[in-house]
Every structure is written in structure tokens, then in C-alpha cells.
Amino acid sequence: MIAPHIPVLARPVSEWLGAVAPLRRLLDGTLGNGGHSKLLLAAHPELELLGIDRDREALARAKEKLNDFADRCTLVHGEYADMQAIAAAHGWESADAILLDIGVSSPQLDEARRGFSWRQDGPLDMRMNQEQALTASRVVNFYGEEDLARIFREYGELRQARKFAHAVAVKRAEKPFAGTAELAEFCETVLGRSRPGKLPLPTLVFQALRIEVNGELEQLRNGLRAALALLRPGGRLAVISFHSLEDRLVKRFMQEAARECVCPPGLPVCVCGHHAEATLPVRGVITADEAEVAENRRAASAKLRIMDKVSR
């Protein structure tokens, strides 16, 4: 049963993107259920939407949700890293505003058959794009032990990554892992119970597998570059992330895009000739207030960063 989907940070997203003038073209690279886009379409009668998602089920839900604005919406099955090519294919030379809401969605987590959650039993799938070949089962049961250790360490930030990867390799040699509940129980058998106040260890393992299956960090790196290129001068990018790996990547990208000088430290004068490509109207992150967190627990970990493309 899918719980009603509540878009996180809906008010700040609507306010910051709604403040762009003129606001005629919005590209939502992670459309999901279309909650953020619906709010902006309702508030801006001239706004056109190009919505992209690699999950066809999400696109179907968004199409229904955005039915009242169908004449202003173009929905595309694809990856947001390819937004420049997708935009060009639909006659868009640029966008006034771009929104990226990174990571797994609540409906994906709520559907056991999608295999994203360790809290309910389902297949080891975790594909956002169900048409791709690579699944979590393939990663867990066939990746080499060294690759598994790297994935658990880098993507899950798991302290016992090598120990867990070795245990997985030994266990699967006897019998391959079949489902999410089995893997979650195995996590606790090998790694022990999570410490109070810390993320459950299965959460870290499942996060690592999901990021690997969907190539999420590479998608984000490429998507950020594509977004900056596609924005018109004066356009605005809003990015919502949910864990430190994503947020560090977004923060670093935006800070570098906003740097005026890239000379090595210590030079008496600037000789690089570099100019900032963007400005940061908000220093730091925007987070949910207590009222939103009370209504939607997932909002507690959401971080919104804003970047404007320089007008020249």
C-alpha cells in the first residue's frame, strides 16, 4: 500500500523557484509524483513543465496528478543527466528554473516488490529504471568481494565494510541471497545491532546497493553540470538531497561554480582569468521546520541548496 506522497520542502521550493522572473519554463529532472511541479504550475499560469523521470510508474502517477495542467506539461521517461539532449529534442534551448529532488522516493520505498526497503520483504531489485539489467541481486550475489567492500565503504559509509563484504561472499557461496528480509537479517547477524541514535546498519547497506544499482552519484555529477549549462543566464537551480554523500557533492559543485578565482592560494594577484558561473543566493542549506517534520518524518533529513546562473 503506497502512503500519500507529500513533497518535501514544498514551500521553500515554490518560493525560491517561483521568484525567478520571468518564469516560463521549468525542468523537473526528478519528477516523481509531480508534487513540487503541481504547486508551481498552479501558481504560475504561463509556466510550461518538462518533467523527467526514469521510473515509468512515477511518470504514470505524475501524469494523473498533473492532469489539470496537461496542456502545459511534457513528461519524458529518461535520466536527468541527459536533460540537455531531452530539452533540445522538445524544442527547449534553455530553462528558467530546474529542480532536482535526489534519491529514492517514498512510493518506491513503500512498494515491497521494488526491493528498496529492508523493513519489508521483497526481491533484491532496487532499480529506479525497471528496464535496466543491473539489480541489487546481481550486485550482492555476483560482484567481487573487493568491489563489494568498496561499495559498502564509499556509498554506505559502513565502518565494517570489508568484514561485511567477506561475510556476504562466504554466505552466497553456500546459497545466493534471495530477498530483502534475508539480507537485512544477515546485516544484523554479521554487524550486530545499530547503536542508539545512529542509522540502522541495514539502512547503510541498502543505501550503498541502491546507489550502485542506479549509478546515483555519477548521475548527480553529470546532472549538475548539465543543469548549469541548460539554465538561461539568471536562471535558478534548486537541489534537494537526503544524505551526506549527495549533499557534499552538491555543495562542492555549487561552491566551485560560484568561485571567481581558481588561482593557487598565496599568489599576490589573480592570473587565472576565471569568472564565476553562478552565485549562491542562500549560504548553506534550507531545511524543514518543526511543523513539516511533524507531518512528514522524511523531511527531517532533507537539505535544499539554491544556485543562480550568472547573468552576463
PLM region spans:
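S-adenosyl-L-methionine-dependent methyltransferase catalytic core, i.e., the SAM/SAH-binding region
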Residues: 1-312
